[in-house]
Amino acid sequence: YTTLFRSAGAFEYRLVRGEGANSNHWYLKTEDDQVRPEIGSYIANEESVQTSFVTRQLDRGGKTEYTDFFTGEKKSTSLWLRQVGRYNSWQDSSGNTKTRSNRYISQIGGDIAAWTDAENQQALHLGLMAGYAHSRAISHSVVNGQRSIGKTDGYGLGMYATWFEDEINQQGAYVDAWFNYSWFKSTVNGNDNPKEKYRSRGLTGSLEAGYTQKLGSNNYGDWYVQPQAQVIWM
């Protein structure tokens, strides 16, 4: 007989010999907190799928001033690029399963339409965005040394709309809304278990509002305060 761990469902089992009158019998035994490391991989994959393309208004910036290289003319563009590299490390409540994950996200977008009022202060922007995300997570059990690797690769397409009360002076209220449709391919590969593949897709939406108030200025620059709130549906 061997005391190697065996997997079934969400738990790891080990072969143990009975005691006393049952010493001639062998049993598969598990503890409530002795879960498979694949659980950590599934959780890491799901977190990546749900949050990779979640943004705030400040993540997308606004107009960017630049000087044309060939003509020297000053111009502006609404094109923006978001690049994110992220590392996470966590463990389950029992401390038996630990997970480390790395993620890379790239998003690009820009306005397709913009409107201003007669004073050119209030402004409404409408834009499109697209992105790619990749994540890799390694989970391992401190009980038996088993480990699991989870990976995700996905794309997103979305649209956003932003209203500013005073875009010129960058003060006052603002409201930002966006939705994003994403689709992912995910894998989970554990020790002595076949690789599991699955697909995920879904729609995520956000509504954000805030107010920017200038507090003052000095030789080093201007000082602002901006209370804000965001509600995300996923």
PLM feature segments, named:
Residues 1-4:
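Short, small-residue-biased leader/transition segments that mark boundaries at the very start
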Residues 6-34:
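Low-complexity acidic/polar repeat-biased segments
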Residues 11, 24-25, 40, 64, ...:
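Intrinsically disordered, low-complexity segments enriched in small/polar residues
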Residues 16-18, 47, 58, 186:
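Short linear sequence elements within intrinsically disordered, low-complexity coil regions
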Residues 20, 68, 72, 117:
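Acidic surface patches and DE-rich sequence motifs
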Residues 31-75, 217-220:
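Outer-membrane beta-barrel biogenesis signature
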Residues 32-39, 74-78, 82-234:
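Membrane translocator/pore-forming domains, dominated by Gram-negative outer-membrane beta-barrels
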